[in-house]
Amino acid sequence: MRDKGDYLFTSESVSEGHPDKVADRISDTVLDAFLAADPYARVACETLVTTNRIVLAGETRGPSTITREYLAHLARLAVHDIGYEQEGFSWRDAKIDVLLHEQSVDIAVGVDAAGNKDEGAGDQGIMFGYACSETDALMPAPIYYAHLILRRMTELRKIGDARAAGLLPDAKSQVTLRYADGKPVGTTSIVVSTQHEDGMSQDEIKAMLRPLVTELLPDGWMCPDDQFYVNPTGKFVIGGPDGDCGLTGRKIIVDTYGGAAPHGGGAFSGKDPTKVDRSAAYMCRYLAKNVVAAGLATRCTIQVSYAIGVSHPLSVYVDMHGTERDVDHARLETVLRELVNLTPRGIREHLHLNRPIYVPTSAYGHFGREPDDRLGTFTWEKTDLAPALKAAFGR
């Protein structure tokens, strides 16, 4: 995204009932079950969901008390919470196959710490984090509002509110924002596709959703009515895993910054925090957000890279996109390394990641969320590093 000039930028989100998000939810449910039993459990759980079928596959290392029957039960509870009790996909009737097996010893030997050896990364890879001053959450505005629309629709649906009457779990949103001199000033178009009960008309759903969406946006930001597209094909009754097969890890741009920042390619859900695809991406977001919160820049991208079995990052890169305020990039890279231990273990300890905190991340974005000290969730969204960054640069 450009820092100056006039342009349009679009991001999309999907609801927790989208097939890929159902898969993400189940994978993170499995992960949390293992971490609740053993904070040092290893999990890489992939889920496939289709018409009345759920398949769990992958690798784990943890307590034998976590049985396949228990995991199947948890998968049903996850589907029930999302709200699927339909003929083609129901928490009651779906057949569940649990095909998880032990983690490879060849991977474990590179990750486990022994003697004085530091714990290595679980794989090679590159990870990115990003923050900007467009919203209070320090997130890009298009993805922020795309998430907000669907979260609100889901909240109302689950409590039986009339403002979401007849809506079903599967939904998508897409928000196009107009930028003037590099700053968001309003929407030019919004798309909302939502599964619904049979018999509801397109006009009825649009009339129900327009005030809901309008109240979530800043004053004057709502697009013209002819640019507010609701169920553009006219009907969306068959949805969820009965309409499309869902797989873990297929919504990585929705999960992060909506295309406003680079992505290293690794998905998050179902992976324990020894997998730097997840934990290092969380740390990069934490660092970038604190750079912006400290007032050192209004935009910040951070990249790190790792090799399997090697504890320290091979590289740390910072880009403030020309928005820095008397801050040298090389100096900032050094300061970040000094303030935070960027080994896999250091990341997990700093952000307290060895806990069952991942189910809430499985929909509506891993970033831009509110940290909850009681639940221990979204610790990477805290800005507690900002004072140290300010001090390091004499602010």
Swiss-Prot record:
State where ATP binds.
18, 170-172, 235-236, 244, 250-251, 267, 271
Amino acids binding L-methionine: 59, 103, 244, 275
Instruction: Determine the domain of life of the protein's source.
Output: Bacteria
Q: Which GO terms describe its molecular function?
A: ATP binding; magnesium ion binding; methionine adenosyltransferase activity
For the protein in the UniProt heading, the enzyme class is transferase
Question: Pathway membership of this protein?
Answer: Amino-acid biosynthesis; S-adenosyl-L-methionine biosynthesis; S-adenosyl-L-methionine from L-methionine: step 1/1
What's the cofactor? Mg(2+); K(+)
GO terms under biological process: one-carbon metabolic process; S-adenosylmethionine biosynthetic process
Instruction: Return the EC number.
Output: 2.5.1.6
* Location relative to the cell: Cytoplasm
Q: Where is this region: Flexible loop?
A: 103-113
Which free-text remark accompanies the cofactor?
Binds 2 divalent ions per subunit.
Q: Does the keyword Thylakoid apply?
A: no
Keyword Glycosyltransferase appears in the UniProt entry: no
Keywords noted in UniProt: ATP-binding, Cytoplasm, Magnesium, Metal-binding, Nucleotide-binding, One-carbon metabolism, Potassium, Transferase
Q: Which residues bind K(+)?
A: 46
Q: Which Pfam families match?
A: S-AdoMet_synt_C, S-AdoMet_synt_M, S-AdoMet_synt_N
Residue spans making up a coiled coil are none
Q: Which family does it belong to?
A: Belongs to the AdoMet synthase family.
UniProt function note: Catalyzes the formation of S-adenosylmethionine (AdoMet) from methionine and ATP. The overall synthetic reaction is composed of two sequential steps, AdoMet formation and the subsequent tripolyphosphate hydrolysis which occurs prior to release of AdoMet from the enzyme.
Question: Could you describe the subunit structure of this protein?
Answer: Homotetramer; dimer of dimers.
- What protein name does the entry list? S-adenosylmethionine synthase
What is the scientific name of the source organism? Acidiphilium cryptum (strain JF-5)
**Which gene produces this protein?**
metK
